[in-house]
Amino acid sequence: MAEQVTSAQATAKTVRIAARKIRLVVDLIRGKSVAEAFAILKFTPRSASPVVEKVLKSAVANAENNFDLDREDLVISKVFVNEGPTLKRFRPRAKGSASPINKRTSHITVVVSEKQEG
């Protein structure tokens, strides 16, 4: 007998925002219901908010379309941010020298699952 799937996930790879900046936003929505998370993200004034909202929307769509889960019963069970590849650039400085510039990227993963009864 096949086991009932109760979670779905979505990932955004190589997002051009540093992981530590995205983690500030992600920490606000961990463990919340999907509706509450969308409300929090809508009013969070950070550049990472729309990106995290897009990944969350994708995870909810995956849950509804692929696994027939109800949107009202979904909570964010896991959400994490990993560092992606770093783009290394150089900025010219005085006296012919140069300083390194690291343009950091991130991978965002959101896992939504059905609320546990009880």
Swiss-Prot record:
Biological processes, Gene Ontology terms: translation
Alphabetically ordered keywords of this record: Ribonucleoprotein, Ribosomal protein, RNA-binding, rRNA-binding
Gene3D superfamilies membership: Ribosomal protein L22/L17 (3.90.470.10)
Source taxon at top rank: Bacteria
Keyword Ribosomal protein: yes
GO CC annotation, single: cytosolic large ribosomal subunit
Gene Ontology MF, one: rRNA binding
Quaternary structure annotation from Swiss-Prot or TrEMBL: Part of the 50S ribosomal subunit.
Family: Belongs to the universal ribosomal protein uL22 family.
Primary role: This protein binds specifically to 23S rRNA; its binding is stimulated by other ribosomal proteins, e.g. L4, L17, and L20. It is important during the early stages of 50S assembly. It makes multiple contacts with different domains of the 23S rRNA in the assembled 50S subunit and ribosome.
Entry protein name: Large ribosomal subunit protein uL22
UniProt source species: Pediococcus pentosaceus (strain ATCC 25745 / CCUG 21536 / LMG 10740 / 183-1w)
